[in-house]
Amino acid sequence: MNCYYIRHLDTDSLAQQLVPFMAQSGFDVTAADMRPIVPLVQERLKTLSEIVERTDFFFQDQLDYDAVLLVGKKMSAAESLADLLRTREALAALPTFEAVLMETPMRDLVAELGLKAGQLFGIVRVAVTGKKVAPPLFDTMEVLGQSRCLERADRAIEKLASLAL
């Protein structure tokens, strides 16, 4: 099935068709598990088989990535660590973890830290997905949920701390 047909499928149909591809890679997921993820990736999928590489992090407890990916563009490991610590605090303080309510405080933090959005959001993206390229950040974080994002931020902080020494 090519990207034209993928883009024109409804969410439930596409979620159902993606389950076998996830199963082939060892992920025990249902169409209901895939349903909230489909809108995040549907426009980006060229083939159904790409689903695993684009969404595996939603179903993994431990992310395996190189700590160097956490170092922001034109930043040191120590700077990235300090900024990720501040971001973790800001995320923990959010009363609700919805994408539309997350974006403004995160952009305010970017300005407060004197960074470009791509610098901070790149660090956060790697921390929560283990990837430099992933579905839209705030939507992804909403699907993952606050507790999983904070746990992943904590692990990323540990990884960055080992680099910053």
Name each model-derived stretch.
Residues 1-4, 43-46, 123-127:
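Short, hydrophobic/amphipathic alpha-helical patches that form generic packing surfaces
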Residues 99-161:
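Charged substrate- and nucleic-acid-binding regions of tRNA-handling and nucleotidyl-transfer enzymes
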Residues 10-113:
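Small-residue-rich helix-loop
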Residues 1-8, 69-71, 133-140:
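Short His/Asp/Glu-rich catalytic/ion-coordination signatures at enzyme active sites or charged loops
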